């Protein structure tokens, strides 16, 4: 166990947003989702775009506290809509979160985190799975 945890977040079915509304609208949604995520983080924690429609977060608090923050944020995102070209776009997100363990390398930590993310997707999306 450690003092920080790592989360990987994926915007669910994002290809459909791009296909239906176009890439400019999709990019706007990703920017807004990322900005909203940053507003929910405590001082010292960091969020960044991981690639495509994924974000990574490094939390400076325990996995339990971080999971609570992510759960609240995921429900917040699901209840919002984003406007692009006068069209309302709603999205949901799935996340996997894990704690960094001192005897594990970075690849192992990210592998466990990625496994938790895909478990969240398999379990129905719009949720956080902690590994």
Enumerate the language-model features and the residues they cover:
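A short pre-motif secondary-structure segment
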Residues: 46-49, 89
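Short catalytic/binding micro-motifs of nucleotide second-messenger systems
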Residues: 39-44, 75-87, 119
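Catalytic strand-loop-helix junctions within cyclic-nucleotide turnover domains
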Residues: 58-66, 85-88, 93-111
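Alpha-helical scaffold within the catalytic cores of cyclic-nucleotide enzymes
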Residues: 34-35, 65-83, 112-114
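Active-site-proximal structural segments of metal-dependent nucleotidyl cyclase/transferase enzymes
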Residues: 1-21, 37, 48
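Active-site-proximal alpha-helical element of nucleotidyl cyclase-like catalytic domains
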Residues: 25-46, 54, 60, 77
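Hydrophobic framework residues that shape the active-site pocket
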Residues: 14, 33, 50, 55, ...
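Catalytic-core segments of nucleotide cyclases and related cyclic-nucleotide turnover enzymes
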Residues: 23, 98-130
């Amino acid at each position: 166990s450690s003092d920080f945890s790592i989360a990987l977040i994926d915007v669910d079915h994002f290809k459909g947003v791009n296909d239906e509304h176009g890439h400019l609208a999709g990019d706007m949604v990703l920017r807004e989702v990322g900005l909203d995520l940053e507003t929910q983080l405590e001082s010292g924690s960091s969020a960044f775009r991981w690639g495509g429609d994924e974000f990574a977060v490094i939390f400076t608090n325990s996995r339990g506290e971080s999971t609570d923050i992510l759960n609240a944020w995921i429900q917040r995102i699901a209840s919002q809509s984003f406007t692009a070209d006068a069209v309302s776009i709603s999205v949901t997100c799935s996340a996997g979160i894990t704690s960094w363990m001192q005897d594990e390398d970075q690849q192992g930590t990210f592998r466990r985190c990625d496994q938790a993310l895909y478990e969240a997707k398999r379990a129905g999306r719009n949720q956080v799975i902690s590994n």
